[in-house]
Amino acid sequence: IRYCCHDPIFLKNRKGEILLLFAKFLDTEVNFTTWCNGRDELWMRKTQDNGRTWLPAVPAGIQSGHASNDSVLLPDGTIVFASTSTELPEYYFGAVQIYRSHDDGESWEKGALLTADDGNRIREPAICLRPDGRLLLFTRTCPGTAGWGTAGNRSLPSYRAESLDGGLTCC
């Protein structure tokens, strides 16, 4: 069986291995009519030779949302990435969950869970590591009632969050 996969991101661990994290629809090859309805989960593949060969895909052990942009590797070896979250029914695909790995991507712990207080939904986060050690996170937004956005929406604010502790908390 083939599966429809989407939203891939690359992660690099302290051993130099490259991980490919992606969302995989579990019940159909092509799922355009039911896009992003919670029936997908995050899977991962790993290469130890800079992409020449890849180990088989395995579940990443993360049951929430879609990653959208690449990760950061902290000086202590912790991998951090942010994902659009499906955990909160009132913010379904409208919140951001930060994930952290201390064992080169073998397992993940949850960090901060972010929402907007003004009724907008935040999604598709991008995260970067500043030279001073701060993590900055930027998100796309859309109105809380618009799903993934609607024609005619001209411009909404882009939200920004900052973490001083590697993504455990954000402000």
Predicted segments with their positions:
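Asp-box/BNR beta-propeller blade signature and adjacent active/binding-site loops
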Residues: 1-171
